A protein has these predicted regions:
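N-terminal beta1-alpha1 cap of cysteine-dependent amidohydrolase-like domains
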Residues: 1-89, 93-99, 220, 224-284
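Active-site phosphate/pyrophosphate- and oxyanion-stabilizing loops and adjacent acidic/basic residues
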Residues: 29-33, 109, 160
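Pocket-forming structural segment of enzyme catalytic cores
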Residues: 10, 117-209
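Active-site-adjacent pocket-lining segments in enzyme domains
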Residues: 113-115, 136, 140, 147-158, ...
Length: 284
């Protein structure tokens, strides 16, 4: 049976329009592209609760899905508002339905909040471009989410959120100098695996985000000036076209976890193989 996955696009319409103008697709479509790269047979639906109440396809409900995943977002949990509370409410419904649940970046704070944890702005500031020296904990090295992943790696990263308190019973799976980078926990009838970075991102996505954030990244001290920011984005666009460009890979300190798409996408692949596809087989 074909597995059915619900992709929850965390961005609002204005942000998605800017993404699409820069890359040709928005965060929801980009996530579907990553999922289908791993398994072309997947049936994927996209909902966008930042805009309005969720409308599933006719005759379909949460119980009809074998997995739910939340994309990244330029929103921040602690700012509140309807475009955020609708997503947290949807996460609670996913937990109640017992559907396998995954989140990239924004998806982790949403699920943590839904399950009773706490999210704040990171006192260390924004993490942008590539999360460095992400290190698996002992639990992470043993967890199916990270099967085949190096014990220390870098990953596409864009976030200001910080997990100040995990839900009861949660397990830390990976950390770096900026804080928690991955966790797993159960809540209500469901189980969540999540990462604070973007395994689904291409180099193009990071370049487009750098251009979208613009001078804010200079003000925050991520880049010396706008010329340095533009050079960074230009390098990543070149890597998108030439992913084996050794001088650029060296310049940005990118190891095998970024050079090899199989490793970059390992967390999503492992979630599909370990949880989603078995759920689809049981559902019949």
């Amino acid at each position: 049976m074909t597995a059915r996955v619900l992709v929850v696009d965390g961005n609002n319409a204005a942000i998605r329009a800017r993404q699409a103008a820069a890359t040709g697709y928005d965060s929801g479509v980009g996530y579907v592209n990553a999922l289908r790269r791993l398994d072309p047979s997947l049936h994927c639906d996209v909902v966008r609760p930042a805009d309005a109440a969720v409308q599933f396809p006719a005759g379909v409900g949460l119980a009809d899905y074998d997995g739910v995943t939340i994309t990244g977002s330029a929103l921040n949990i602690y700012n509140g508002g309807a475009e955020i509370t609708r997503q947290v409410d949807l996460a609670r419904a996913v937990f109640d339905a017992g559907v396998p649940f995954f989140g990239s970046c924004w998806g982790l704070p949403v699920a943590v909040t839904a399950a009773g944890g706490e999210v704040r702005a990171n006192p260390r500031g924004r993490e942008f471009g590539f999360g460095r020296r992400i290190t698996l904990t002992e639990a992470g090295r043993a967890h199916r989410l990270f099967a085949g992943k190096p014990a220390v790696f870098e990953a596409p990263t864009i976030h200001l959120d910080y997990i100040a308190r995990l839900p009861e019973g949660a397990v830390e799976l990976a950390t770096n100098d900026m804080g928690l980078q991955a966790a797993a926990f159960s809540h209500a009838r469901g189980t969540f695996w999540g990462v604070q970075y973007h395994p689904e991102y291409e180099y193009l996505d990071i370049a487009a985000a750098a251009e979208r954030y613009g001078v804010r990244l200079v003000t925050e001290g991520m880049f010396a000036d706008e010329a340095a920011l533009a050079a960074f984005a230009r390098d990543l666009r070149q890597l998108q076209a030439r992913p084996d460009d050794a001088p650029l890979l060296w310049r940005h300190g990118l190891g095998t976890a970024m050079r090899d798409p199989t490793l970059r996408l390992a967390e999503i692949r492992n979630w599909l193989d370990a949880v989603v596809l078995p759920h689809a087989r049981r559902r019949g």
